[in-house]
Design a protein with these regions (language model features):
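Structured loops at beta-to-helix junctions and adjacent beta-edge loops in soluble globular domains
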Residues: 1, 16, 25-27, 140, ...
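Cys/His-rich short segments
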Residues: 1-12
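Short, basic and Ser/Thr-rich N-terminal targeting/leader segments
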Residues: 6-7, 18, 83-85
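Acidic-glycine-rich active-site phosphate/pyrophosphate-binding loop
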Residues: 12-39, 88
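ATP-dependent carboxylate-amine ligase
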Residues: 33-36, 40-49, 59-69, 73-285
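PAPS/PAP-binding and catalytic site of the sulfotransferase fold
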Residues: 53, 57
Length: 285
């Protein structure tokens, strides 16, 4: 308050019975910006980390001279889709299973993700008539992390998922195959049975694609699945095969080009059509 009274600027959250409002304050002026639960990236206001991100972005934009209308439009149209936020809270519906794909790979990230999951599942339970919603998580961490960090990741995941499936990255970063997964699973088991800990089962499926298939085979309509990924495009491609619908980013791989288009298929189609544009698809030497 003193900062603003002296002519300073601030972005604050005004909590009301109708929801939380992001407000920009400049001196004695207070300018309402947006309801947090109406911003797509906040998942109905349950993703508090994206509420914080929205406030930071709004503050930076306002300080740079952007108008309130432009800031509102930016916040209201930004989503966590692959196109705008690849690998960060990408949401996919797979036969009515709510799948969230994210790069989370450490305990602090899992803690924040888990806190979101608690709020999101509670909101979803109030909107659903499907009965109990199970939460299944596929988790992993990089091999070059401290062993204590690997165990901690599993311990945190145990708090928030009914079933935890532990996988490993393609690059082991100096570890023996299975070593990292064993430590993460050890962390999960260390918490199972404690009051307030959800996890009742932990499994190890080392290969990422196999782990995705295993998790999805266990899920029922209405469940929430969180896939913490290493090879994002491969996972999206697998989900695409399950849904038989194109999924964003499933053809990204390591090549430059449109993330939704298969470059090999495009080349074959162009050649079959005798299209001179096929030359444009050929890699330069």
């Amino acid at each position: 308050d003193d900062h603003c009274r002296r002519g300073g600027r601030a972005v604050v959250l005004d909590r009301t019975d109708r929801g939380d409002m992001i407000v920009i304050r400049h001196g004695r002026r207070s300018m309402q910006l947006a309801w947090t639960h109406l911003l797509p990236a906040t998942f109905g206001g349950t993703a508090l980390f994206n509420v914080a991100n929205a406030m930071a972005a709004a503050g930076a934009a306002f300080a740079s001279g952007a108008g309130l209308h432009e800031i509102r439009q930016g916040l209201r149209t930004f989503t966590t889709s692959y196109y705008l936020s690849p690998g960060r809270m990408n949401q996919v519906n797979v036969h009515n299973v709510d799948v969230i794909v994210d790069y989370c790979h450490n305990a602090p990230g899992m803690r924040v993700l888990g806190e979101f999951l608690e709020r999101y599942a509670s909101m979803k339970s109030g909107q659903s008539d499907l009965g109990k919603i199970s939460r299944i998580g596929m988790v992993a961490t990089a091999g070059d992390r401290r062993e204590a960090d690997m165990i901690e990741l599993g311990a945190v995941a145990a708090e928030h998922f009914d079933v935890v499936v532990v996988r490993e990255d393609e690059r082991l970063r100096g570890r023996e195959r299975g070593f990292t997964a064993d430590l993460v699973a050890q962390g999960v088991r260390s918490r199972m049975g404690e009051p307030g800990v959800r996890c009742r089962q932990v499994e190890i499926v080392l290969d990422e694609t196999d782990a995705v298939r295993h998790v999805m085979a266990r899920a029922n309509p209405g469940d929430i699945v969180v896939l913490t990924v290493d090879q994002h495009a491969a996972v999206m491609s697998e989900l695409e095969a399950m849904t038989k619908q194109a999924q964003p980013g499933s053809h990204t791989k390591d090549s430059v080009g449109d993330p939704d288009m298969d470059p090999e298929a495009m080349m074959e189609q162009a050649k079959e059509a005798g299209d001179s544009a096929a030359r444009d698809l050929e890699p330069s030497s």
